[in-house]
């Protein structure tokens, strides 16, 4: 396992674009006998993924908001420490919905795995998982927690530096009016000024932006603007 962590650290340091990084992660997973890999970054209920899991599973995961149900994500948030997991071994402790989730994942060769979560900036977290079709992960020795966190920390930095395109992410949208108003907000206008420029009432701007803030689950226009820019919605 230490050899795997060394390989991950080396991969994060290789020069190249995001395609080289994604191909390298896929090759690493295959070389060590895993079904695939998944990197998740979670910030204020917004989740993005870089993964080679099956396309249908990726779609189902995000369309059904499985990140809110996923026992692996829940455990990662609570302990921030490398761990192995198994849907079958944990079955007796799971809810009916969680058992159904694992059963669905097993259809795509995801039955067990190793996950390394780390804290990242501004209250966010990232986690890297290698998934297996085996009923459980058989570790020959305990994983070095410090080495694991260091390897994933370097991977997170590399993905952030490359501004890697997510394989999949939470659905997000702005309607045309919301996008227009928010573009003006992004360049420093007040809501009153936006209303004047667009020839609408102040309340129309306020209500539209309030609706968008509620949808994105944020409490300020500044946060909404930052999310919209980050997700290239404006």
From Swiss-Prot:
<keyword id="KW-0614">Plasmid</keyword>
<dbReference type="GO" id="GO:0043565">
    <property type="term" value="F:sequence-specific DNA binding"/>
</dbReference>
<comment type="function">
    <text>Positive regulation of conjugal transfer of Ti plasmids. TraR activates target genes in the presence of AAI and also activates traR and traI themselves.</text>
</comment>
<dbReference type="InterPro" id="IPR005143">
    <property type="entry name" value="TF_LuxR_autoind-bd_dom"/>
</dbReference>
<dbReference type="InterPro" id="IPR016032">
    <property type="entry name" value="Sig_transdc_resp-reg_C-effctor"/>
</dbReference>
<dbReference type="GO" id="GO:0009372">
    <property type="term" value="P:quorum sensing"/>
</dbReference>
<protein>
    <recommendedName>
        <fullName>Transcriptional activator protein TraR</fullName>
    </recommendedName>
</protein>
<dbReference type="InterPro" id="IPR036388">
    <property type="entry name" value="WH-like_DNA-bd_sf"/>
</dbReference>
<dbReference type="InterPro" id="IPR036693">
    <property type="entry name" value="TF_LuxR_autoind-bd_dom_sf"/>
</dbReference>
<keyword id="KW-0238">DNA-binding</keyword>
<keyword id="KW-0673">Quorum sensing</keyword>
<keyword id="KW-0804">Transcription</keyword>
<keyword id="KW-0010">Activator</keyword>
<feature type="domain" description="HTH luxR-type">
    <location>
        <begin position="167"/>
        <end position="232"/>
    </location>
</feature>
<feature type="DNA-binding region" description="H-T-H motif">
    <location>
        <begin position="191"/>
        <end position="210"/>
    </location>
</feature>
<dbReference type="GO" id="GO:0032993">
    <property type="term" value="C:protein-DNA complex"/>
</dbReference>
<keyword id="KW-0184">Conjugation</keyword>
<keyword id="KW-0805">Transcription regulation</keyword>
<dbReference type="GO" id="GO:0001216">
    <property type="term" value="F:DNA-binding transcription activator activity"/>
</dbReference>
<dbReference type="GO" id="GO:0000976">
    <property type="term" value="F:transcription cis-regulatory region binding"/>
</dbReference>
<comment type="similarity">
    <text>Belongs to the autoinducer-regulated transcriptional regulatory protein family.</text>
</comment>
<dbReference type="InterPro" id="IPR000792">
    <property type="entry name" value="Tscrpt_reg_LuxR_C"/>
</dbReference>
<dbReference type="Pfam" id="PF03472">
    <property type="entry name" value="Autoind_bind"/>
</dbReference>
